[in-house]
């Protein structure tokens, strides 16, 4: 809240959110809620791409709330940026229409922002730029899966439980051997692993880019909406380890701790 920030005599952290999810307006709360729980004052800055068509979006909402990367960093650069996923794992990165603009933004953010968080597809994209390409699956990895922290003393992972769960919703993964090779070569630091999902949380060696291939921000309602959407396609299995009759969010602590860092 701006008035509370003024009374606390602190400057809110300006966090850019590059939202490329379909039906982006409906998705916004998934990020706003955990960010709002931070003890720090957060000013979300919604960012749009100039080369993305936003076919499923409310364009009035997009144009009223979202600004370009250049506008978001003028006159002062952002403190950090979150880049969402997008259901485009089947495409080679260079085939994505907005790939060049995406690369420009993440390269500039690495120099101007304290940290970049890439979720799901954005995490894959950052891994690709670090030298590890995704492997596309025949079937969607969908459900809630256990992960194990690999670096308990890490500034981020040290706040997490040694084992925790997180939603996954993706058609791709990163080969274990290539990820381990990237760590040996000093390109990536591996932070969390799941037996059925592979290396899911990792970071660049300079700790300025954090990649999370899961969807810690998802609510139960978001998963249910994806189930309904997938039913129409008819080619996606039901989510694993997820009770459709329960409203419990068992990954809440992981989500909240992640977004409060």
Which role fits each region the language model picked out?
Residues 1-51, 66-67, 73, 77, ...:
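Amide-donor transfer/coupling interface in amidating biosynthetic enzymes
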Residues 60-69, 93:
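Helical hinge/lid and interdomain linker segments adjacent to catalytic or ligand-binding clefts
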Residues 78, 83-154:
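Cysteine-nucleophile active-site neighborhood
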Residues 27-30, 56-59, 93-94:
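Short, glycine/acidic-enriched capping/hinge loops at junctions between secondary-structure elements
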Residues 50-64:
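N-terminal beta-loop-helix "entrance" segment that forms/cooperates
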């Amino acid at each position: 809240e701006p008035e509370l920030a003024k009374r606390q005599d602190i400057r809110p952290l300006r966090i850019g959110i590059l939202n490329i999810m379909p039906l982006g307006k409906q998705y916004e709360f998934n990020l706003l809620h955990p960010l709002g729980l931070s003890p720090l004052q957060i000013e979300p800055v919604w960012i749009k791409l100039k080369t993305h068509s936003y076919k499923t979006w409310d364009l009035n909402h997009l144009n009223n709330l979202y600004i370009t990367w250049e506008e978001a960093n003028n006159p002062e650069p952002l403190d950090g940026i979150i880049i969402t996923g997008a259901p485009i794992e089947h495409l080679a990165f260079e085939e994505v229409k907005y790939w060049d603009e995406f690369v420009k933004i993440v390269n500039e953010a690495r120099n101007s922002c304290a940290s970049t968080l890439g979720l799901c597809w954005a995490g894959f994209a950052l891994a690709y730029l670090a030298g590890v390409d995704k492997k596309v699956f025949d079937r969607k990895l969908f459900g809630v899966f256990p992960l194990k922290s690999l670096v308990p003393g890490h500034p981020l992972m040290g706040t997490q439980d040694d084992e925790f769960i997180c939603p996954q919703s993706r058609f791709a993964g990163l080969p274990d051997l290539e990820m381990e090779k990237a760590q040996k070569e000093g390109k990536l630091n591996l932070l969390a692993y799941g037996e059925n999902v592979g290396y899911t949380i990792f970071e660049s060696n300079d700790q300025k880019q954090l990649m999370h291939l899961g969807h810690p921000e998802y609510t139960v309602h978001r998963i249910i909406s994806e189930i309904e959407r997938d039913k129409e396609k008819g080619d996606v299995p039901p989510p694993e380890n997820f009770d459709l009759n329960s409203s419990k969010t068992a990954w809440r602590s992981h989500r909240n701790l992640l977004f409060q860092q």
